[in-house]
């Protein structure tokens, strides 16, 4: 049986109203989701997109939040969730010929990055592997490898 530990393992950093298209930010976020902190920094510094700089600042902020609240080292951090949502759209009017006006839409986005410390295990094991309670739904090979029945 697995029991939840009460220690917090995830922290997040949120940046709102960035003057950037959500689709262009998602292109960068998809590259860093699930990677380690150090690998993420290398990727963001070398990618040639404008969206990399605010995301890089946000990853730094999430790492400093993790160091402050969980006392975790940067080596153990992994980007567990990263999402981009559309923000508000501001409209400006550009004057055109014959007294007409043309609407220019400035899109914004909200970016959330969740960092997880992998050194802090989320579950503590109460029963040993020698006597598992899940033996009726999952079989074990003779060499000890677990596989799911389907």
Swiss-Prot record:
One of its GO terms (molecular function) is structural constituent of ribosome. CDD domains: Ribosomal_L22. One of its GO terms (cellular component) is plastid. GO terms for biological process: translation. It comes from the Eukaryota. SUPFAM superfamilies: Ribosomal protein L22. The keyword rRNA-binding applies. Transmembrane segments: none annotated. The keyword Ubl conjugation does not apply. It is found in: Plastid. Keywords: Plastid, Ribonucleoprotein, Ribosomal protein, RNA-binding, rRNA-binding. This protein binds specifically to 23S rRNA. Part of the 50S ribosomal subunit. Belongs to the universal ribosomal protein uL22 family. This is Large ribosomal subunit protein uL22c.
